[in-house]
């Protein structure tokens, strides 16, 4: 009897230590996405799946290298928030742009899943569906919702990566150009590399009528490279954030109150008042 008891205690202890070790690896991988990076964004529509007579695929989208500061604005055991800030131009002309934000939450059960037309449906996950997983919550430049997904970080063969597929609104590069689809089904891969990190995408451009009827118009691939550089390359972005972070703290807190209601969200394109 005692032997079984000690075996049980050993297995429980081993499981706990293993879980804590995995959590530390996950956290270290996420924190490696912070810093100053030289970034390039590259997208290409690869396969046309529709038979629409007047269909016009998107042109390839490639950017020149820009600096992007990814700064941790919250960091605890189960929640890491990273604000991205673009720094474009040189001493003759420089522009600072508050870019996207990503929150990583461990074993999160509350998701907002994008439906279409600026509508997100609240979803409460079962524990078996989020145990050991991290939710990546991605926000627009104004901290409004964009897309969310829950998956496990994987550490194998010297690689650390996280993969997930989730619906999202049209990207900014297409929002003003394309009206023939209304959902981008994003398959994201975030992988930590020896040069920084890589954001790969295999996306589907979807014309969604309702929860049952939809058409996949085309496939798209994306290759976004974040190459780590010296921190002083992003000094203007950091200065801008130090001057403006309190204002954005207020904005985030207002949005946090809305998200905490755990209800479906619908955003208006215009506000009259």
Give each language-model segment a name.
Residues 21-36:
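N-terminal helix-cap/turn-to-beta initiation motif at the start of protein domains
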Residues 74-77, 81-155:
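Low-complexity, serine/threonine/proline-enriched polar segments
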Residues 127-185, 205-207:
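Short helix-loop boundary/capping segments
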Residues 57-74, 83, 99-103, 185-192, ...:
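Hydrophobic/aromatic beta-strand elements that line small-molecule binding cavities or substrate pockets
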Residues 22-26, 42-77:
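Short, solvent-exposed loop/hinge segments that bridge or flank secondary-structure elements
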Residues 10-19:
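Hydrophobic h-region of N-terminal signal peptides that target proteins for export
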Residues 182-189, 194-273:
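Acidic, serine/threonine-rich low-complexity disordered tracts
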Residues 1-6:
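Positively charged n-region of N-terminal signal peptides that target proteins for export
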